[in-house]
Amino acid sequence: MNHSDIPAVALLLSSIQNTFRWKLDYGPWQTEIGGQMIFTDNHSKAGTGIVPVIPNYTEMQAGAYGIQKYRYERTAVEAGIRLDRQETRAGGYDWTGNYYGGNRKFCNFTYGLGGHYRLSKYWELTSNFALTWRAPHVHELYSNGNELGSGMFVRGDASMNAERSHKWITSVSYRDKVFHIRLDSYLQWIKGYIYDEPLKENITVISGTYPVFRYRQTPAFFGGADFDFRFMPAASWEYHLIASFIRANEQGTGNYLPYIPSFHLSHELAWTHQTKSHILFRLTARHKFVAKQNRFNPATDLIPYTPPAYHLFGAEASMECPVKH
């Protein structure tokens, strides 16, 4: 019997979003207040023959905020506060036929302080410190089944709390006709960082055997930087380089956290030429380097090693020709 026309997953998602924003400018000051309300209804459609990995759920989010800004000559500062509330109602039957789900409510107050200063004609400095939060997703709370896209059997934790973090970001940039340079660095302390961890066990269901992962929370520290460099020596030539790295550890133990990207570097050299008839030619050579992740704990991942470092090389040639109508 052919069931190839029946999808493995069929979800009906309905969402209503409302946003309100009001601004007032007076001299060097600007005041902004606003609010947002989002209602989401997610239900799986019957008849697929496969139990969905998450239960049906509805979610109501509401928030209100206020921002005060001040600008004077080279300086700009701002401060903001926000209050959010989220309620999630979930219910369904798992692959064993047992009912599961629940009702969770989250409420949080956050704030942010930031400043921007133009050091000179070409240099700028920006810094921001904020308290942020993220409520756990239904997938992290109530997952209990096989993820069709990843081949993992995932279990949520309905007792998890919201993530709360303090984040400090500082940026320095330089910009003129030839160079565009920007360095962003950040530090982040997270209370209740959420991630999925392998339990080092397998489970067998009708469709096969899968490794079991479970969502958990831990205090974590993140630090990293992003570097963006552009060099335009002539109208036809441009060199662009992007590099990024991140460090992440579990607070208290210092253990490495899983799924953290290793050092990345990508750059390209492009040549463009436009003829008098407006035909545009472009040649590009690219290179990307991804380092091996050595900050790795085999106990918190599915396999006891990380992939080796690798290089990717590419080239592209294109032509754009305008067509008269």
Can you name each region flagged by the protein language model?
Residues 12-16, 58-62, 105-109, 164-168, ...:
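Residues that define the transmembrane beta-barrel architecture of outer-membrane proteins
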Residues 2-10, 17, 47-56, 93-102, ...:
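Extracellular loop and loop/strand-boundary signature of outer-membrane beta-barrel proteins
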Residues 18-26, 64-70, 113-117, 160, ...:
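Residues on the lipid-exposed face of transmembrane beta-strands in outer-membrane beta-barrel proteins
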Residues 9-21, 63, 155-161, 167, ...:
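Outer membrane beta-barrel strand-and-loop segments of large Gram-negative receptors
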Residues 41-44, 55, 85-96, 103, ...:
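Surface-exposed extracellular loop regions of Gram-negative outer-membrane beta-barrel proteins
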Residues 27-28, 73-74, 121-122, 166, ...:
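Short coil turns and loop connectors of transmembrane beta-barrels in diderm outer membranes
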Residues 1-118, 123-124, 130, 174-175, ...:
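Face-selective signature of the C-terminal outer-membrane beta-barrel domain
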Residues 186-190, 207-293:
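Gram-negative outer-membrane beta-barrel transporters
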